[in-house]
């Protein structure tokens, strides 16, 4: 994650790019969700970046994909900076900032499609030499990390399922990557 974030500080749209990556790896969002998220979904009633993503069904997969995902502190900080840029850009063009506008926009200010987000990830991982990675890799990383930390924070796999927006725990379990070292430690602790 650190290597990717370091690389993203060098891109032309670095703040947007950092937010795209963090939405995937820290919030476990799908490409479609990243493309569809609006400022309204990440702000509080006063218009400040809130403490959670209130992902609506329209932005998610299926009619029951809406969910609330607490904001990781790094993602929250990145969203605050990106929002400052977005507000300034709108005002520069003579338009008021609109909370219903998309968080992630193209260089020209238009909405990015899920396909564009998927291609963005493909280019990113290709530039970094990460073969076999896709727009879903960050989501898998987030879900695996949540699962590994669940018992430490007093949660359950049901919490991971809810964060991931899966209707079935079996689907969530398919995302969780096995760890040989963790298996060894589990056997040794009992």
What does each of the following model-derived ranges do?
Residues 1-27, 31, 156:
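Basic, Lys/Arg- and aromatic-enriched nucleic-acid-binding interface segment
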Residues 6, 36, 44, 174-177, ...:
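Phosphate-coordinating loops and pocket residues in cytosolic domains that bind phosphorylated ligands
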Residues 16, 131-149:
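Short basic/aromatic active-site micro-motif
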Residues 26, 141-166, 174:
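C-terminal catalytic core of tyrosine-transesterase DNA break-rejoin enzymes
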Residues 36-75:
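Conserved tyrosine-mediated DNA breakage-rejoining catalytic core shared by Y-recombinases
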Residues 59-61, 164-166, 170-189:
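Catalytic-site neighborhood detector that most strongly recognizes the C-terminal catalytic loop/helix
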Residues 60-80, 98-122:
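C-terminal catalytic core of Y-nucleophile DNA break-rejoin enzymes
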């Amino acid at each position: 994650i650190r290597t990717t974030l370091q690389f993203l500080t060098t891109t032309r749209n670095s703040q947007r790019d950092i937010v795209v990556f963090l939405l995937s790896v820290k919030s476990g969002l799908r490409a479609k969700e990243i493309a569809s998220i609006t400022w309204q979904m990440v702000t509080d009633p006063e218009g400040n970046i809130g403490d959670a993503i209130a992902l609506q069904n329209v932005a998610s997969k299926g009619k029951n994909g809406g969910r609330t995902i607490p904001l990781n502190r790094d993602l929250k900080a990145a969203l605050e900076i990106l929002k400052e840029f977005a507000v300034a850009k709108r005002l520069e063009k003579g338009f008021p900032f609109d909370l219903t506008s998309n968080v992630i926009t193209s260089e020209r200010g238009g909405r990015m499609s899920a396909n564009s987000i998927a291609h963005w990830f493909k280019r990113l991982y290709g530039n970094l030499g990460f073969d076999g990675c896709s727009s879903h890799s960050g989501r898998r990383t987030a879900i695996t990390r949540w699962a590994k930390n669940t018992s430490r924070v007093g949660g359950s796999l049901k919490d991971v399922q809810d964060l991931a927006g899966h209707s079935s725990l079996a689907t969530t379990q398919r995302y969780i990557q096995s760890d040989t070292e963790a298996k060894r430690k589990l056997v040794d602790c009992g």
